[in-house]
A protein has these predicted regions:
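Short aromatic/basic micro-patch
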Residues: 6, 47, 76, 154, ...
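Core beta-strand-centered patch of the WYL/Sm-like small regulatory domain
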Residues: 10, 14-122
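Single conserved hydrophobic/aromatic residue that forms the stacking wall/gate
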Residues: 1-8, 12-13
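Polybasic (Lys/Arg-rich)
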Residues: 103-190
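Short, solvent-exposed coil/turn segments
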Residues: 6, 72, 146-148
Length: 190
């Protein structure tokens, strides 16, 4: 249920499939938003603090701080799954959490924008995959050679089925070596 006492203004967008303008307005004004999030079978009302928007995989995503559910923290929401976006009078929260926020790093660890528990994952790859790994993870990870045939590196990953699918897509040329729980998660899927 939307709380009328928090509502500052409702942005009505014509000729746009999503409430992008309302969200940009809230970001620029430093205000919280409330919306219905369309989850399969159970839409939920959310009240969050928007900070950034990104276009990824053909969709807009709102990067926001949420503290209405535990654990509080930075989350992302697909904008096309939002309905009834309201810009509230309440000032947004999460300034400390976004002070050092690095959007490119956030995007690299979320495969296809799916969330999951974050782990430091060590990947062992065949040498021919160096360009593909650099394209995905950038120049930050240190690639440690293992002779002339392989290398390994460690990166933060939000582990999800999409991450496991990405690993499998290399046809055995990428191996998860650590941590054991993430490695066994892939073995359970295959």
């Amino acid at each position: 249920e939307i709380m009328p006492s928090l509502v500052g203004s409702e942005m009505c967008i014509r000729d746009r499939p999503y409430s992008v303008d309302a969200l940009f307005s809230a970001i620029n004004k430093g205000r919280m938003v409330q919306f219905r999030y369309k989850k399969v079978g159970r839409p939920e009302t959310r009240t969050i603090s928007p900070w950034q928007m990104v276009w990824e995989n053909g969709c807009y995503y709102l990067i926001a701080y949420q503290d209405e559910k535990s654990p509080a923290g930075i989350r992302h929401y697909r904008v096309d799954k939002m309905a009834g976006v309201l810009v509230l009078d309440a000032p947004r929260r999460g300034k400390a959490q976004f002070a050092g926020f690095d959007l490119p790093s956030y995007l690299k660890k979320h495969f296809n924008m799916y969330g999951g528990p974050e782990h430091s994952v060590t990947l062992r790859c065949t040498a021919d995959l160096e360009p593909a790994m650099r394209e995905r993870f950038g120049t930050s990870p240190i690639l440690i050679p293992e002779g002339e045939t392989h290398f390994h590196f460690t990166v933060p990953i939000c582990v999800s089925d999409q991450f496991y699918g990405w690993v499998c897509g290399f046809g055995g040329k990428v191996e998860i070596t650590a941590p054991a729980a993430v490695r066994s998660g892939l073995q359970e899927m295959t």
